[in-house]
Regions:
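Basic, alpha-helical terminal appendages of large translation-related enzymes
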Residues: 1, 13-16, 42-44, 157, ...
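N-terminal catalytic cores of NTP/NDP-binding nucleotidyl/phosphoryl-transfer enzymes
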Residues: 1-58, 226-245
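Residue-level signal for inorganic ion chemistry
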Residues: 17, 141, 299, 487
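A structural motif corresponding to the C-terminal end of an alpha-helix
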Residues: 37-40, 108-121
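Charged, often glycine-rich, active-site loop that binds/positions anionic groups
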Residues: 50-67, 137-138, 142, 280, ...
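A glycine-rich helix N-cap at a beta->alpha junction
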Residues: 64-98, 109-112, 116
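Active-site cores that bind ATP or allylic diphosphates and position pyrophosphate for catalysis
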Residues: 114, 118-270, 275-291
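Catalytic adenosine-cofactor/nucleotide-binding cores of aminoacyl-tRNA synthetases and other
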Residues: 245-250, 272-418, 492-516, 520
């Protein structure tokens, strides 16, 4: 075979959740690895716009969309909402009003995929059917329907009724596909009726007989999955954990591929769920963080890294309102160091694949300031950001160092404004906080000694000062909690001005203590 085909797809039933990017990144990385191994490959990505509209996302007006339940997604009007930023039309071009529901949400997702640097070949499921590319697969499935029904029963235990056919017709009268039932096939046309066969949509009560070809019908999805393997010649296609379990959809599709279509199914790469804050995502219900929302919180290389650095068999638990993002940056930085040291192991490979092939400059060595320290510095208007980064680096900054620092500052501000935990947020107060008045005498005396310590050691670095503070605490015999809570309340701004983020990082690593008030100690002592 000249070109190996890697494929993935997503149904555009609503705002597509970030978990769907795991499949995108895995398949994109496989395609790249094949190409680098001198094995030509193509990465096909399908926006499935032919599935029935079966649920209304919570953020849409139910009364407005209820009458469209049961229609193919491409036949449902686009929501009357602002066009998603960067969304692409079916022809791959930017701008314009999305022509239907599937294009509204699918276009938004395609824009995220392109931003991540994956050169996928996008297509729509409706085009496969309407252009006749699925005709042979439909004919074979209809003629071998009893075999498909037997496979369903043997794999999952689900018994199909007599004369069952694995297709849904698009009703000639109401245009719905989710409410029809195929009754018989005479070799040319399928007889069907449109009724109340599902709980989520209402049929028109009519029926007829029509050709199932050229978009008149679609295969039911497990049979359709195998048919796409057959029609597109797919060699690699992974699937989520829920589909890849024993007796699941993938096992059924693989058997249909072999026994009905006479082909070997593609290599499967089962991958685990992506949780946001411990919850599994749902596209059609509008539950969870969308791909676009998370893509706005992280630069492309970090989002790619997030999807790659854990084994596909492990759950990714991502909580932007906790420590996940600072920890993710720290992990990325450790992988970068391994790559720059000339390592050839998994860390170095994952770091390289976290950058698009076209981004060779992004692989160049640079200073990587800790994200948690950057998040602190951007909240300190009295500090010159790049000067503080230079102090951390211990050398003059090159252009790539500045670019990296400024990118991290941009995303740190975005994170702080949207969802960062309170412990990462700081505010310089202009008036004495009420809590400062409650400091006990021993705390005030301790602060006076700290002031003297600072004045006596004006050039001490953060690490040295950290040690001297511990010595002072021991000498005074003050409880650690009382000593450090007074420092947090009254002293941190002074230390930040004098020692910059270097002190902040070392200090907070040892003494994480939630607070939101910073006040100069000299007001108290």
């Amino acid at each position: 075979k000249v070109t190996l085909v890697v494929r993935d797809e997503k149904t555009a039933s609503g705002r597509i959740h970030v978990g769907s990017l795991r499949g995108v990144v895995i398949h994109g990385a496989v395609s790249r690895a094949l190409s680098e191994a001198k094995l030509p490959s193509a990465f096909f990505y399908e926006i499935n716009d032919f599935d029935p509209f079966d649920d209304i996302p919570s953020f849409l007006n139910r009364e407005e969309f209820e009458r469209h339940l049961g229609k193919p997604l491409f036949a449902v009007p686009a929501p009357d909402l602002p066009a998603p930023a960067g969304a692409l039309r079916a022809d791959g071009q930017a701008g314009g009003t999305p022509e239907n529901y599937a294009e509204y949400f699918g276009g938004e997702f395609i824009a995220v995929i392109k931003r991540l640097g994956f050169a996928a070949e996008f297509y729509r499921a409706s085009a496969l059917y309407r252009e006749g590319r699925m005709n042979d697969a439909i004919r074979i499935a209809l003629l071998r329907a009893p075999l498909i029904a037997r496979i369903y029963e043997e794999v999952s235990g689900a018994k199909r009724e007599k004369n069952w056919l694995p297709v849904s017709l698009v009703c000639e009268h109401c245009g719905k596909i989710g409410t029809t039932k195929a009754l018989s096939f005479d070799g040319e046309r399928v007889k069907y009726e449109c009724g109340n066969f599902v709980e989520w949509a209402v049929g028109c009560g009519r029926g007829g007989a029509m050709s199932p070809y050229n978009g008149g019908a679609k295969l039911l999805w497990k049979a359709e999955w195998a048919a796409k393997f057959f029609v597109l010649g797919v060699d690699v296609e992974g699937a989520g954990k829920d589909h890849s379990t024993k007796g699941g959809a993938r096992e059924i599709a693989d058997r249909i591929a072999r026994e009905v279509y006479g082909i070997e199914p593609p290599v499967n790469i089962p991958y685990e769920f992506f949780h946001v804050g411990g919850r599994k995502m749902s596209t059609s219900r509008g539950a969870g963080a969308s791909a676009r929302e998370i893509a706005e919180l992280l630069p492309p290389k970090l989002l790619r890294f997030l999807m790659l650095y854990k084994d596909p068999a492990r759950v990714i638990d991502f909580d932007p309102s906790a420590d996940t993002i600072p920890n993710l940056y720290d992990t990325y930085d450790s992988y970068a160091e391994e790559f720059w040291k000339g390592g050839a192991g998994d860390y170095a490979k994952i770091f390289r694949f976290s950058h698009p092939r076209a981004d060779a400059r992004g692989l160049g060595e640079r200073f990587l300031p800790r994200f948690s320290e950057v998040a602190y510095l951007v909240q300190m208007p009295h500090l010159e950001f790049l000067k503080e980064i230079e102090k951390m680096a211990g050398r003059s900054l090159m252009a790539e160092d500045k670019q990296e620092a400024e990118e991290r500052a941009f995303y740190a501000r975005r994170w702080l404004e949207s969802c960062a935990p309170e412990k990462y947020k700081f505010e310089i107060q202009k008036a004495l906080p009420a809590a400062a008045k409650a400091l006990r005498e021993e705390q005030r005396k301790a602060l006076a000694r700290v002031r003297a310590l600072l004045e006596a050691n004006p050039m001490a670095d953060g690490q040295t000062l950290h040690g001297k503070l511990h010595e002072l605490k021991t000498e005074l015999g003050i409880a650690p909690k009382d000593f450090f809570s007074a420092l947090y309340l009254s002293l941190l701004v002074t230390l930040a001005v004098r020692y910059g983020g270097n002190f902040y990082g070392q200090f907070l690593d040892y003494h994480l203590f939630p607070f939101s008030i910073i006040f100069p100690f000299w007001v108290i002592v």
